[in-house]
């Protein structure tokens, strides 16, 4: 199965670029599943319902978010109504939406988990405890974990959550931050 993961889409210029390029990338590489972090897709910060619909229409199977997800009020109903837009799973259960979805593909069902790190972020549960609980409930064998965090050290720890069970994408790495060289393969198929 071929995945494309894009993030962090920022403002109108980022949204316009994704709308223009993503369909071509999907075609060129034969992508079977696309995950896009759209939490900053709106020009005013956050993501609106229209932004999410545009990303989904141009090819995003799942849109993940982070701590800015609730900045645009129009996203609230969409979070509750659609399975393609996620907020972090470790937000309080009273928050709109969910942080876990299962999407059917020709290759089987892919479970996507969206998490947010706790450093410099208030009112979120432990991401490791949250993902452990989700894994115990799921019967899926293919997981896609998106983990947005504010500190690079958390990246290494997140790699062990779904070892040999998943694809993992750590988000919130922007081009103006120092290079991390944090890529590593834990075991085959992770």
Describe the residue ranges of each PLM region:
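Acidic, metal/ion-coordinating pockets
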Residues: 1-190
């Amino acid at each position: 199965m071929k995945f494309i993961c894009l993030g962090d889409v920022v403002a109108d210029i980022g949204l316009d670029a994704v709308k223009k390029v993503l369909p071509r990338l999907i075609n060129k590489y034969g992508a079977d599943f696309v995950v896009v972090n759209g939490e900053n897709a709106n020009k005013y910060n956050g993501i609106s319902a229209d932004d999410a619909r545009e990303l989904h229409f141009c090819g995003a199977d799942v849109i993940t978010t982070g701590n800015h997800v609730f900045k645009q009020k129009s996203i609230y109903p969409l979070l509750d109504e659609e399975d393609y837009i996620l907020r972090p799973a470790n937000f309080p259960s009273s928050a709109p939406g969910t942080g876990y979805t299962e999407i059917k593909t020709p290759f089987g069902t892919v479970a996507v988990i969206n998490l947010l790190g706790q450093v410099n972020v208030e009112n979120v549960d432990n991401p490791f405890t949250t993902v452990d609980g989700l894994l115990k409930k799921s019967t899926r064998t293919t997981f896609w974990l998106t983990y947005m965090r504010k500190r690079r050290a958390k990246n290494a720890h997140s790699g062990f959550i779904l070892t040999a069970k998943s694809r993992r994408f750590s988000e919130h790495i922007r081009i103006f931050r120092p290079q991390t060289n944090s890529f590593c393969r834990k075991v085959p198929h992770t």
